[in-house]
Amino acid sequence: MVPCLQVCKAKACSAIEVQIALESLSTTIYNNEEWTLRDTCEELWLTEPKKCFKKEGQHIEVWFDGSKNNCMQYVAWKYIYYNGDCGWQKVCSGVDYRGIYYVHDGHKTYYTDFEQEAKKFGCKNIWEVHMENESIYCPDSVSSTCRYNVSPVETVNEYNTHKTTTTTSTSVGNQDAAVSHRPGKRPRLRESEFDSSRESHAKCVTTHTHISDTDNTDSRSRSINNNNHPGDKTTPVVHLKGEPNRLKCCRYRFQKYKTLFVDVTSTYHWTSTDNKNYSIITIIYKDETQRNSFLSHVKIPVVYRLVWDK
């Protein structure tokens, strides 16, 4: 069967367009790079971002409605070659909570918009981005008042160490606390060349906190008692500190793991601190075993970092 005239004309025009682009690219410094037939084929030329040459794609998984069973795969390219105002340029893809983009003549250009994809494949306008060992959670899934510059969530673990560790009574904001590191390997975090805003420093700790029975009305003298006294009842907790909308998103996700904790607070902040841009949520456990199970099974956006409110 012979294709119709319109189809033949469209294919011929596309082939000529690719040929002209390759001839133009061959006059640049990029002609010394290794190029394969796949790198220069028409199919890849018309793949997003269109009318650009692309190399070394990395698959990105997006989970819609927070479900791994409702996921789609997209591609972020290590190298993108586009013909801009200053001739041919070589850039790489970037990934953030909004989508996949590249910088075209100084402008961030998204070629995959996760919000639009969520409308097609999801119902709750919630999505998670997963690539290799990194994940991005969209703050828009819990609040319409989110800011575009989202700080990473830091896990704040205020703990009482095991019996073999010496602990001290700690006044929040005034003294340092004695903590013990959890045995085992420290979680690994690979810095992504796509999005420097997700850089973090890893420091893994485990503890549990005993809150003093006497509560001073002066917030500056409020203290957390970590001394191991016979008969004292301790409650294992984990504190997460970060940007409020991001914390709400984490708290929403934790509902899938209700059997791994007793309760979780709403977002709050200490009245004694001047920094109101960060909030805290506290997760309470019935014992250390449950807490350890929670930390083993629940994926938190960034690795644990010890932070004391000042």
UniProtKB/Swiss-Prot annotation:
It holds the Pfam family PPV_E2_N. It is found in: Host nucleus. GO terms for molecular function: DNA binding; DNA-binding transcription factor activity; nucleotide binding. Residues 234-310 are annotated as: DNA-binding domain. Residues 189-202, 210-221 have a biased composition (Basic and acidic residues). It comes from the Viruses. Residues 159-239 are annotated as: Disordered. The keyword ATP-binding does not apply. There is a cross-link at K241 (Glycyl lysine isopeptide (Lys-Gly) (interchain with G-Cter in SUMO)). Keywords: Activator, DNA replication, DNA-binding, Early protein, Host nucleus, Isopeptide bond, Phosphoprotein, Repressor, Transcription, Transcription regulation, Ubl conjugation. Residues 1-143 are annotated as: Transactivation domain. Phosphorylated. Sumoylation plays a regulatory role in E2 transcriptional activity. Belongs to the papillomaviridae E2 protein family. Binds DNA as homodimer. Interacts with protein E1; this interaction greatly increases E1 DNA-binding activity. Interacts with protein L1; this interaction enhances E2-dependent replication and transcription activation. Interacts with protein L2; this interaction inhibits E2 transcriptional activity but not DNA replication function E2. Interacts with protein E7; this interaction inhibits E7 oncogenic activity. Interacts with host TAF1; this interaction modulates E2-dependent transcriptional regulation. Interacts with host BRD4; this interaction mediates E2 transcriptional activation function. This is Regulatory protein E2. It comes from Human papillomavirus 56.
